[in-house]
Amino acid sequence: MTDYARYIDHTLLAANATEQQIVTLCDEAIAHHFYAVCVNSGYVPLVAEKLKGSAVQVCSVIGFPLGAGLTSSKAFEAKAAIDAGAQEIDMVINVGWLKSGKIDAVKADIQAVRGVCAAIPLKVILETCLLDDEQIVLVCEMCRQLDVAFVKTSTGFSTDGAREEHVRLMRSTVGSEMGVKASGAVRDRETAQRMIEAGATRIGTSSGVAIVSDDAAAAGNY
């Protein structure tokens, strides 16, 4: 039987997320033994304090949700998040640069963040709903070359979330050594299982409790 809890990055990234909601997120993650709690960098100090002494990892998004900021800003934010207690980093690529053919700039953007979190896992968010298959493969290959830990489908803030076919393509491109994180619109156990079967090794969701309990009514009201 699948141990769904160990796949889950329990996530709350909404602009209007309150401190109490973040505390609840952490309490749920500890109670259900989720892999990580994923939040915006401003909440990393709170999450690090709440999770202290537990096995749950602190994950921060960077350049979220657009990925369109300066590379130097992303690197600075990543370092600040790590200094505040982040143990994993999820960064968004610059999709506009990719679609403009600025491949070297996209690579340098990832490399800059990779440089400041060399000691911890980096997950690179592609925003697959905005890319064609060729672009997905290109970024996955780039991440493999840069020794990135995970490629990740989506922010959950664009036109679509994780799709099985994209997870499958990402897995086939990066091979068995790298992680693949499916995020966005994974709200129940059935969807999570499909993503895992397609090759996902981590699930980003605010519905972790619903997934592990197989009870849609238990989804977080985030």
Curated annotation (Swiss-Prot):
Q: Which reaction does it catalyse?
A: 2-deoxy-D-ribose 5-phosphate = D-glyceraldehyde 3-phosphate + acetaldehyde
**Annotated NCBIfam families:** deoC
Q: What is the protein's name according to its record?
A: Deoxyribose-phosphate aldolase
List the molecular function annotations (GO) for this entry: deoxyribose-phosphate aldolase activity
Q: Which residues form the active site?
A: 90, 152, 181
Enzyme class, first EC level, given as a word: lyase
| Gene that encodes it | deoC
Q: Which domain of life is it from?
A: Bacteria
* Listed pathway(s): Carbohydrate degradation; 2-deoxy-D-ribose 1-phosphate degradation; D-glyceraldehyde 3-phosphate and acetaldehyde from 2-deoxy-alpha-D-ribose 1-phosphate: step 2/2
Q: Which organism is it from?
A: Pectobacterium atrosepticum (strain SCRI 1043 / ATCC BAA-672) (Erwinia carotovora subsp. atroseptica)
Protein keywords: Cytoplasm, Lyase, Schiff base
Q: Which family does it belong to?
A: Belongs to the DeoC/FbaB aldolase family. DeoC type 1 subfamily.
- The answer, when asked if Lyase is one of the entry's keywords, is yes
Which spans are transmembrane here? Answer: none
A cellular component annotation (GO) from this entry: cytoplasm
Provide the function of this protein: Catalyzes a reversible aldol reaction between acetaldehyde and D-glyceraldehyde 3-phosphate to generate 2-deoxy-D-ribose 5-phosphate.
